[in-house]
Regions:
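Envelope-exposed proteins and targeting segments
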Residues: 59-62, 67, 72, 245-248, ...
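N-terminal targeting/tethering segments
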Residues: 36, 41-170, 239-323, 450-461, ...
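Signal peptide processing junction and immediate N-terminal pro/mature segment
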Residues: 21-41
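Peptidyl-prolyl cis-trans isomerase
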Residues: 97, 101, 134-147, 161, ...
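Sec-dependent N-terminal signal peptides
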Residues: 2-28
C-alpha cells in the first residue's frame, strides 16, 4: 500500500508543479497502517522492544574502486540483470556469455569516462546544464509538495462513501482519488499563496510587454528558417540576447524570474498545450504563474535546507554522472562512419541466419514461484495430469495463451527449447520473466524452421547491427585506455559467488 501511495504522490506532485493537480493518496483509515517519512526525521525513541528498533541495513559490499567512485555488489548485480537479457528479437547472433568480471570492468570503464568528462568540462555544455538545473528544481519542489500533502491531506472513509453515492459508476479507489483532487487543489493553492507572501513576491508588470514582444518575434519571425511552427529551445538559447534573457518579470526573497526562465518553462510544454495568448501582457502574466509556482516551492525547499541534504546531493551527482557518460560516449562516437553498401552486403552474406524469419517454437508455459514448485508441476505432468490443470494450480501467469518464442528472446535457453519435439514437456528450466528470470515448465506445441529473408528486407537491420558492433568496439577500446590511465582496484574475490543466471531469479529484487 505504501508503494502504491508513493507512486500516486509522485504523479500528484509532478502535476502540482506545472499548475495541474490530480491526486490519489491513501485514506485516513489506511494511514493508520502506513509508516510515512517525515521531512525532518525525529530522533528514534528508545525502546526495549526489539521489534520497534530501526532496521539496520548491512554496509554495501564494495567490489571495485576508481578515483572517488565505489562500485558496490548491488550495483554490479543490477547491471548484470540488464546485460543478461537479449536486446533484440529480430537480428540475433550467437549468445554471448556474460560474466560478472567483464561487466564489472565495463562499470569501471564507465566511471573512468565520467571522471574524464568532468575533467574536460562536459558539465559546461549548455544543454546538459539546462537539463540538470531543471531536474534539480523538480526534485526540490517535489519534496516540498510531497511533505505538505503527507502532513495535511487526508480522506475519510465517509467522504469516499459519499462520493460513491454521488458517482455510482466509480470504484472505491477512483472515488478516493476524486475526493483527494477536490480537497487537494484548494489546499495546495492556499499553500502556494502562503509561499508568495512568505517570500514577498512582486510582479514586475512593466516588463510583461517586453516578454510578449520577444515571444512574438521568436514565434513569427525566427532568425533562421525552421520546419516547426512553435518556438524551439535552440531559439531561446541562440536568438535571445543576454540582455533580453535577464529582463526581470518577478522578484522574491533570494531570487527572481527572468524572461529566460519564462521561455524555458514554455519550451517544457508540448506545443499543442502552449498558451495562445502570449502575444498580450495579460497572457504573459497568466503564464508567469506557472513559472512562479515551481520557483516558490524551490525557494521553500532551500529555506528548509533540502538542497544541502546528502541524499539529494548524491542523486544530483548520479544524475550528472549519467549525463556526462552519455555525452562522453556520444562525442567519442559522433564521427564513426556508417558502413557502406559493400560492407553491409558482405556482412549479410556471412551471417544470413541472423536475419532469417525464425526459427521459432510455439510454447505453452507454466511460470513458477521457485524451483521446488516447478519440479512439483513437472512431476504431476509426468504422471499424466492435464497441462492446463497443472498450469491453473501453479503458474504465476494463469491466463496467458500459448505464444511463439524466438532465439533472440530466449538467449541462452534457446538450444534446450529447440531440441524438444512437438508435444514434449521440458523443464524445469529458467527463462526471462518480468525484470529477471524464473523457473518454468514448457510444453512445445510446434516448431518452425528458419526461412531466409532477402537482403532488401534486412538491409537497414544489417547496417545498424554493423554500426552498433563498431560503436561497442570503439567504446570498449576507449574504456580500456581510460582504465589504464586512471588507477583502479577490483576485488574479484567478492564476486566469486555471482552467477548471472541466478542473481536474476524470481521474485525480482526488492519485492
Amino acid at each position: 500500500m505504501l508503494e502504491r501511495r508513493n507512486i500516486v504522490l509522485v504523479s500528484f506532485v509532478s502535476l502540482v508543479l506545472t499548475g495541474i493537480v490530480v491526486a490519489g493518496l491513501g485514506t485516513s483509515s489506511q494511514k493508520k497502517h502506513m509508516k510515512l517519512p517525515e521531512s525532518s526525521p525525529a530522533p528514534a525513541a528508545k525502546s526495549d522492544d526489539a521489534s520497534l528498533a530501526p532496521e539496520v541495513k548491512p554496509s554495501p559490499i564494495v567490489v571495485a574502486k576508481i578515483g572517488d567512485y565505489e562500485i558496490t555488489k548491488d550495483e554490479l548485480v543490477g547491471r548484470l540483470l540488464v546485460e543478461i537479457r537479449p536486446h533484440s528479437e529480430e537480428y540475433t547472433g550467437p549468445w554471448k556469455t556474460v560474466s560478472p568480471e567483464s561487466v564489472l570492468l565495463t562499470l569501471v570503464a564507465e566511471k573512468a569516462m565520467m571522471m574524464e568528462g568532468r575533467k574536460t568540462g562536459a558539465l559546461d555544455d549548455p544543454i546538459l546544464q539546462a537539463f540538470i538545473e531543471r531536474q534539480k528544481r523538480q526534485k526540490l519542489g517535489n519534496r516540498v509538495v510531497m511533505d505538505y500533502i503527507r502532513q495535511n491531506l487526508t480522506v475519510s472513509d465517509a467522504e469516499i462513501d459519499q462520493m460513491m453515492k454521488s458517482r455510482p459508476n466509480v470504484t472505491r479507489e477512483q472515488a478516493s482519488m476524486l475526493v483527494q483532487r477536490a480537497k487537494g487543489i484548494p489546499m495546495l493553492e492556499q499553500f502556494y499563496k502562503q509561499l508568495q507572501a512568505k517570500f514577498h513576491y512582486q510582479a514586475v508588470k512593466e516588463n510583461f510587454a517586453k516578454a510578449s514582444a520577444i515571444h512574438e518575434r521568436l514565434l513569427l519571425n525566427p532568425a533562421r528558417p525552421r520546419n516547426e511552427s512553435w518556438i524551439l529551445n535552440s531559439q531561446v538559447r541562440d536568438d535571445v540576447t543576454k540582455e533580453e534573457k535577464a529582463i526581470v518579470l518577478g522578484t522574491y526573497d533570494g531570487g527572481q524570474i527572468t524572461v529566460k526562465d519564462w521561455l524555458d518553462t514554455l519550451c517544457e510544454i508540448a506545443p499543442p498545450g502552449r498558451p495562445k495568448d502570449l502575444n498580450t501582457p495579460e497572457g504573459v502574466e497568466k503564464f508567469l504563474d506557472r513559472t512562479l509556482r515551481s520557483a516558490m516551492f524551490v525557494a521553500e525547499a532551500k529555506a528548509r535546507g533540502y538542497d544541502k541534504d546528502p541524499q539529494y546531493l548524491r542523486e544530483i551527482r548520479d544524475l550528472e554522472d549519467e549525463q556526462i557518460l552519455y555525452k562522453v560516449q556520444a562525442d567519442k562516437t559522433k564521427d564513426l562512419p556508417e558502413p557502406n553498401e559493400a560492407e553491409v552486403t558482405a556482412y549479410f552474406e556471412k551471417h544470413k541466419e541472423w536475419f532469417a524469419n525464425g526459427p521459432l517454437v510455439k510454447t505453452d508455459q507454466i511460470w513458477c514461484q521457485d524451483l521446488a514448485t516447478a519440479r512439483k508441476a513437472k512431476e504431476e505432468l509426468d504422471s499424466g495430469k492435464d497441462f492446463n490443470s497443472v498450469k491453473e494450480s501453479y503458474s504465476l501467469q494463469k491466463n496467458v495463451q500459448p505464444y511463439d518464442t524466438y532465439r533472440g528472446g530466449e538467449g541462452p535457453f534457446w538450444d534446450d527449447l529447440w531440441k524438444a519435439e512437438p508435444n514434449q514437456v521440458v523443464g524445469p528450466m529458467k527463462g526471462f520473466y518480468d525484470d529477471g528470470l524464473a523457473w518454468r515448465v514448457v510444453k512445445v506445441l510446434a516448431k518452425t524452421p528458419a526461412k531466409d529473408r532477402p537482403f532488401a528486407e534486412v538491409r537497414d537491420g544489417a547496417k545498424w547491427t554493423i554500426f552498433s558492433e563498431r560503436r561497442r568496439t570503439l567504446l570498449d577500446r576507449y574504456g580500456k585506455e581510460l582504465r589504464d590511465q586512471y588507477k583502479y582496484d577490483v576485488y574479484l574475490d567478492r564476486i566469486q559467488d555471482l552467477d548471472p543466471l541466478d542473481v536474476a531469479l524470481y521474485p525480482p529484487r526488492g519485492k
